[in-house]
């Protein structure tokens, strides 16, 4: 499980920390409080790109021996000290990213 955070939300948190004396010498996890598996993310992307018109099939490699399977950051300090909560959902991030990537592909840039 991983937490995916929109860069604009991260920038907001950084600005809040820069302008808050209570943030000096403190550490913050700047993240959403919602976790997703890689399969969850793949399904979301697939549905946004293809809808239900095509079946999604998975192929798996062996997992990395020392991979952390579940990463759940505590966002308590960011909320309590900075007043920060990530606002942008992963679905909203994908709605912005997918057209941008499609455009770059159509221009031959990727």
PLM regions: where:
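C-terminal substrate-binding subdomain of Rossmann-fold SDR/epimerase-dehydratase oxidoreductases
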Residues: 1-110
């Amino acid at each position: 499980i991983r937490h995916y955070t929109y860069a604009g939300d991260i920038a907001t948190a950084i600005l809040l920390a820069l302008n808050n004396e209570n943030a000096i010498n403190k550490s913050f996890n700047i993240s959403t409080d919602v976790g997703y598996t890689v399969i969850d993310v793949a399904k979301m992307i697939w549905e946004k790109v293809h809808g239900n018109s095509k079946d999604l099939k998975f192929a798996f490699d062996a997992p990395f021996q020392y991979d952390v399977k579940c990463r759940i950051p505590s966002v308590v300090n960011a909320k309590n000290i900075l007043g920060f909560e990530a606002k942008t959902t992963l679905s909203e991030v994908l709605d912005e990213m997918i057209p941008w990537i499609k455009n770059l592909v159509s221009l031959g840039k990727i």
